[in-house]
């Protein structure tokens, strides 16, 4: 195999010799390997070096102890060829884990990424690496580190054991002024040998790479011919510290500290601590055996004095405990069952695989994500120190209900309706136009980072409750989640909202359904009757970014009626198999006397209309949704 070599000089690390130990995080070449980078003649391991040194003991340096170092590293060029199926979106690349474990599949994508970036974005630069702890993350970490070194990256900051939530990656990038970061996650999709894995890249602002880069990545996967790899040993990710090879270093960092520090800056922890330490206030957080399990105890228990047993499923597992780490009423059923008991907690929440989504519940009360972001925005200035000067602007994704619109109108704030995808919020934040935003898909966040943030949303709700309860004496009735929501509805009106998900539909039928709906839209006219509803307009949503002028088209088929009701159809490709058809149904109700009606009853006529208009059963063969939110 042909190879090229590069040498980097370094100052020899003088230290007490203690021997350097490395624990391979993937099988040896004699075992079933994850990549041809392992099974070919190159095993991504440095040659024996007599000058390998180790420093033991704690260090007061923020970068931790130096674990090992070497005078030089070899960079090898490994021949490769394009692999089909690496089309990349703003959520990165998601496939079944077995696909990523195929020869060079991940390595090709990582090299294609470096081939897509300007040299100054990574040469001698610092990049962050972390993920949600799912199966294959540790092995993938080693591949990414070696290819990063091979391409001239100066430093990798990696979470201990490869753990960093998606919000934490964004926070670390911003705090440490890194040039970007890799996030190893398939978000809320299941994990394990038979399930999903994913990878995406975030820019120096902490937000996902724009389409201009993801399109280049895909283009480069179609023409790639070599992978640049540094021959260094696997990095021990189990201990905080710095490992150096030539001019390249890997710093294993505490995955909690930077994120916790940011949360302490955003929120009044003393105020929240006063709430969670009350004997008459019940709290429960379900980490779903996902990445927020690593954050829940340090934040909620150790810092905010919640009871230790208030954290459920708090140990991150590679397969999420055989669960589906999607915080909704279907997949977080254990939490829902507890919250709907007569003696259930006052407040409950759950987060997803990589920690960027959230679900909020009161006792026997579910808060829709659309209402949640609106209520946070309406209360932010008085309850959250970060917003003392007031939010700069508000925004929601197009399918999200119009609840937030009414808050923006009352508070006289700039408002934006954007396509689904957090990058659209990030552009507005970077331009100073936006503070609080959300998506109906259980994503809520603010400009403290450039990703949605599950724990942030939970702390925001706890802040709102704590602000209302702080003067309540033991024995006095506490303000409940339901009280906060009902007060909001009385002020702004209620947007009845539901989403029907039909997961893993045959892609051909799902796409034909959307094309059929686009044909209806093209022929539609205002004033047409759809049952008892009168059409105001129908379109396929398009968005022109007010910051960079870019246009996103075909973002969802909308039917908007004169009474404010909406039906929206979208396809989601974030799963690793088939397509997910999503139908969103919304109806605004200003009459307080009608706010207690069950949402599914209130919008049933619209649901029936949505199914009839789309001919969903005819196109997909599906009679019932997989998930109703």
From Swiss-Prot:
Residue numbers of Phosphoserine PTMs: 187
Give the InterPro entries listed for this entry: A-D-PHexomutase_a/b/a-I, A-D-PHexomutase_a/b/a-I/II/III, A-D-PHexomutase_a/b/a-II, A-D-PHexomutase_a/b/a-III, A-D-PHexomutase_C_sf, A-D-PHexomutase_CS, Alpha-D-phosphohexomutase_SF, PGM
Any idea which UniProt keywords this protein has?
Carbohydrate metabolism, Chloroplast, Glucose metabolism, Isomerase, Magnesium, Metal-binding, Phosphoprotein, Plastid, Transit peptide
Task: Give me any GO biological process, just one.
Answer: glucose metabolic process
- EC nos: 5.4.2.2
SUPFAM superfamilies tied to this protein = Phosphoglucomutase, C-terminal domain (SSF55957), Phosphoglucomutase, first 3 domains (SSF53738)
Give the location in the cell: Plastid, Chloroplast
PROSITE patterns linked: PGM_PMM
How's its activity regulated? Inhibited by the Calvin cycle intermediates fructose-1,6-bisphosphate and ribulose-1,5-bisphosphate.
Its Gene Ontology molecular function terms?
magnesium ion binding; phosphoglucomutase activity
- State how the cofactor is bound: Binds 1 Mg(2+) ion per subunit.
Where does the record say the transit peptide is? 1-69
Active-site positions on this chain: 187 (phosphoserine intermediate)
The enzyme class is isomerase
Q: Which cofactor does it need?
A: Mg(2+)
Binding residue positions for alpha-D-glucose 1,6-bisphosphate = 94, 187, 356-357, 420, 439, 441, 452
- One Pfam match, by short name? PGM_PMM_III
Q: Name one GO cellular component term.
A: chloroplast
Family, according to the entry, reads as follows: Belongs to the phosphohexose mutase family.
Q: Which NCBIfam families match?
A: PRK07564.1-1 (NF005737)
Kindly state the subunit structure of this protein: Monomer.
What name is this protein filed under?
Answer: Phosphoglucomutase, chloroplastic
Q: Say which species the protein is native to.
A: Brassica napus
């Amino acid at each position: 195999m042909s190879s090229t070599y590069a040498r980097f000089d370094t100052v020899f690390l003088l230290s007490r010799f203690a021997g350097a130990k490395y624990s391979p995080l993937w099988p040896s070449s004699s075992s079933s390997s994850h990549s041809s980078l392992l099974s070919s003649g190159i095993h991504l391991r440095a040659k024996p070096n007599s000058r390998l040194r180790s420093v033991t003991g704690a260090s007061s340096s923020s970068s931790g102890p130096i674990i090992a170092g070497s005078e030089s590293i070899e960079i090898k060029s490994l021949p490769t060829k394009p692999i089909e199926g690496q089309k990349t979106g703003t959520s990165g690349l998601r496939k079944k884990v077995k696909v990523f474990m195929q020869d060079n599949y991940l390595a090709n994508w990582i090299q294609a990424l470096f081939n897509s970036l300007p040299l100054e974005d990574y040469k001698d630069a610092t990049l962050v690496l972390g993920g949600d702890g799912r199966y294959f993350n540790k092995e993938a970490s080693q591949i990414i580190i070696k290819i990063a070194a091979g391409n001239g990256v100066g430093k990798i900051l990696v979470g201990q054991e490869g753990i960093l939530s998606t919000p934490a990656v964004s926070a670390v990038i911003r705090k440490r002024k890194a040039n970007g970061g890799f996030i190893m996650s398939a978000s809320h999709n299941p994990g394990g040998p038979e399930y999903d894995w994913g990878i995406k890249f975030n820019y120096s602002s902490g937000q996902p790479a724009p389409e201009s880069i993801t399109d280049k990545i895909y283009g480069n996967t179609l023409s790639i011919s070599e992978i640049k790899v540094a021959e260094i040993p696997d990095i021990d990710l189990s201990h905080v510290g710095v490992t150096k090879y030539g001019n390249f270093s890997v710093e294993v960092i505490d995955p909690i500290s930077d994120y916790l520090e940011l949360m302490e800056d955003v929120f009044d922890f003393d105020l929240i601590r006063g709430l969670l330490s009350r004997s008459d206030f019940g709290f429960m957080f379900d980490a779903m055996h996902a990445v927020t399990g690593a954050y829940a105890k340090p934040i909620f228990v150790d810092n905010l004095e919640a009871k230790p047993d208030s954290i459920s499923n708090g140990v991150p597992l590679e397969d999420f405990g055989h669960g589906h780490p999607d915080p909704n009423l279907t997949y977080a059923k254990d939490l829902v069952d507890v919250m709907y008991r007569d003696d259930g907690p006052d407040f409950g929440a759950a987060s997803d695989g990589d920690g960027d989504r959230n679900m909020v519940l009161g006792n026997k009360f579910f808060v829709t994500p659309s209402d949640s972001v609106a209520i946070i925005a309406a209360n932010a200035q008085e309850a959250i120190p970060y917003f003392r000067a007031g939010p700069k602007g508000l925004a929601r994704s197009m399918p999200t209900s119009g609840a937030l619109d009414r808050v923006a109108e009352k508070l006289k704030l700039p408002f934006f309706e954007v396509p689904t995808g957090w990058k659209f919020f990030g552009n507005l934040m970077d331009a100073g136009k936006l503070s609080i935003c959300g998506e109906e898909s259980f994503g809520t966040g603010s400009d403290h980072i450039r990703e949605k943030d599950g724990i942030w949303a939970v702390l925001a709700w706890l802040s709102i409750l704590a602000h209302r309860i702080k003067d309540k004496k033991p024995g006095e009735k506490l303000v409940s989640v339901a009280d906060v929501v009902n007060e909001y509805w009385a002020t702004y009106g209620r947007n009845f909202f539901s989403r029907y998900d039909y997961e893993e539909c045959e892609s051909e039928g799902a796409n034909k359904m959307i094309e059929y709906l686009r044909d209806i839209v093209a022929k539609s006219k205002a004033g047409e009757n759809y049952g008892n509803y009168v059409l105001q307009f129908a379109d396929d949503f398009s968005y022109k970014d007010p910051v960079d002028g870019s246009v996103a088209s075909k973002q969802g088929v909308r039917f908007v009626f004169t009474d404010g009701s909406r039906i929206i159809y979208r396809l989601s490709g974030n799963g690793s198999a088939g397509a997910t058809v999503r139908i969103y149904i919304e109806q605004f109700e200003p009459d307080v006397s009608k706010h207690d009606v069950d949402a599914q009853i209130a919008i049933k006529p619209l649901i029936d209309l949505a199914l009839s208009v789309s001919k969903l059963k005819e196109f997909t063969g599906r009679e019932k949704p997989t998930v109703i939110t």
